[in-house]
């Protein structure tokens, strides 16, 4: 629905044109593709049929079956890991964020139909811990189980959970480099007797704020909708200048703007439903295999999850600051989770562009990135 050219065949366009869309759409909502088909018209990067609450007007005005095939697949994505296709949901969908509707495991027919129509994205590269040590699918599963268990822990702040998981991967990387793959089981066994708080404390060490700013600026720069005249490089430097206090930081997804100094005075302490939401969003990206896609190593893939978490953190605080509040509310967190899915996890042009993804991957290879992000957000250095 956002930033994608959505292809529609001529028969579907003819069917949709029988409905009067003039109440919401100015002009023809369909753009010829020059090959006999069409694209859905985009305005400011959004499909013209996408309502302000991110719900599809074709679905609400007509029926689900009247939507183009690619739209019917939303919010489902599939990752093929080995011979298994894992389904995951996009949190850009408001129903997913609200946890509305039937559980996905009760919708087997829809899953099978959508998988057949939309297909999956398979991993072709061997699994790697850190780009150096090749590991098996079984070893990946054992590491993932520990990470998911920690991320789901309701008694520790999410930042501690993220730091503990990042520290686990850092330890695995250093130990396997020294003694080989036998260190994997030794490390996983050793952390069973340690608390998340203890491991997270180790994970905060050696984090340099300077290592985080460039990564965040790349992803947050996609969201400066009010600066659409700028190139991607220009948007990157806009975020960098905002972090230096030279201008306000803008977010199109949050419809907000505030100085970085005001943003850092906002407390990001999700509770109740908002804590459950952002935990569910983060856990789903790991458990569903999103972090294992492409050629990413486990370290790089988890760092993508780290970036997603801190984008949620920053954007929620930005919206609160723009409204003069000192703490984030549920709406701040909900909209930030939706934005992170758009900017980082599922729909980011940066991820789907091979050139920019290679550049980003090189920045996401550091085992210290989570510690750097934590230090950066706390504002000890810009």
Task: Please provide the spans of the model-predicted regions.
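Internal, well-ordered alpha/beta segment that forms a basic, Gly-enriched binding/recognition surface
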Residues: 62-160
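General structural signal for secondary-structure boundaries
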Residues: 7-11, 96-104, 135-140, 329-336, ...
């Amino acid at each position: 629905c956002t930033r994608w050219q959505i292809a529609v065949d001529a028969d579907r366009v003819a069917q949709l044109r029988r409905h009067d869309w003039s109440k919401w759409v100015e002009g023809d909502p369909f753009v010829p593709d020059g090959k006999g088909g069409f694209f859905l018209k985009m305005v400011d990067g959004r499909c013209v049929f996408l309502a302000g609450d991110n719900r599809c007007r074709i679905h609400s005005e007509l029926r689900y079956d009247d939507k183009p095939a690619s739209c019917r697949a939303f919010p489902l994505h599939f990752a093929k890991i080995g011979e298994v296709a894992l389904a995951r949901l996009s949190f850009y969908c408001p129903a997913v964020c609200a946890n509305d509707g039937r559980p996905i495991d009760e919708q087997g027919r829809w899953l099978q139909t959508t998988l057949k129509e939309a297909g999956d994205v398979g991993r072709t590269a061997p699994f790697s811990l850190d780009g150096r040590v090749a590991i098996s699918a079984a070893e990946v599963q054992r590491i993932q189980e520990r990470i998911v268990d920690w991320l789901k822990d309701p008694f520790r702040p999410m930042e501690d959970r993220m730091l503990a998981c990042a520290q686990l991967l850092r330890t695995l990387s250093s130990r396997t480099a020294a003694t080989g793959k036998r260190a994997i089981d030794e490390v996983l066994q050793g952390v069973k007797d340690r608390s998340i708080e203890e491991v997270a404390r180790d994970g905060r060490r050696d984090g340099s704020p300077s290592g985080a700013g460039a990564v965040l600026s790349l992803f947050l720069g996609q969201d400066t909708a009010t600066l659409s005249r700028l190139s991607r490089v220009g948007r990157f430097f806009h975020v960098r200048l905002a972090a230096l206090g030279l201008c306000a930081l803008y977010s199109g997804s949050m419809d907000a703007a505030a100085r970085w100094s005001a943003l850092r005075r906002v407390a990001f302490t999700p509770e109740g439903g908002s804590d459950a939401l952002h935990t569910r969003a983060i856990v789903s990206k790991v458990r569903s295999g999103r972090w294992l896609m492409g050629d990413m190593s486990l370290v790089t893939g988890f760092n993508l999850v780290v970036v997603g978490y801190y984008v949620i953190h920053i954007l929620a605080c930005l919206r609160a600051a723009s409204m003069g509040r000192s703490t984030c509310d549920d709406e701040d967190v909900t909209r930030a989770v939706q934005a992170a899915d758009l900017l980082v996890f599922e729909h980011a042009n940066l991820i789907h562009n091979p050139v920019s993804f290679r550049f980003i991957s090189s920045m996401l290879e550091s085992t210290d990135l989570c510690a750097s992000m934590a230090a950066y957000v706390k504002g000890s250095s810009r």
